Amino acid sequence: IGGEPYITHPVAVEKIVKEWGGDTDARITALFHDLLEDTDAKEEEIEAIGGPEVLQAVRLLTKKKGYDMAEYMSGIEGNAMAKLVKGADRLHNLQTAFCTDEKFKRKYIDETKKWYMDLAPGIADLVKRLEDSCKQS
């Protein structure tokens, strides 16, 4: 979003995870959370650097083609590290969604309200601010 370098988002997510008290594995997971989805990184590489717990969380955070949202969220809810990172990821995405087009913003708000409201402190406030900005446009 916004043409920023790829690394900007994972670093921002890692900072949020750190602020929320995430341990080293959670912070590594934050940095790696989009690798399987957005790059050519291999699971073996992630495991070699982060270990099996980080790999498991990254797998849970990776949206596969044709994924079922309820199953995806169920997996995340069952893994404390994945849940922490997903909350931070969504929070950062909401913070940067102010820069996107209105149709995308509306869809993102609706999806957040349905699936993500309990994942992170501050999400409800950001959703309200986004909704208000949509109404003003």
Named regions from a protein language model:
Residues I1-S137:
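Active-site helical microenvironments for divalent-metal-assisted chemistry
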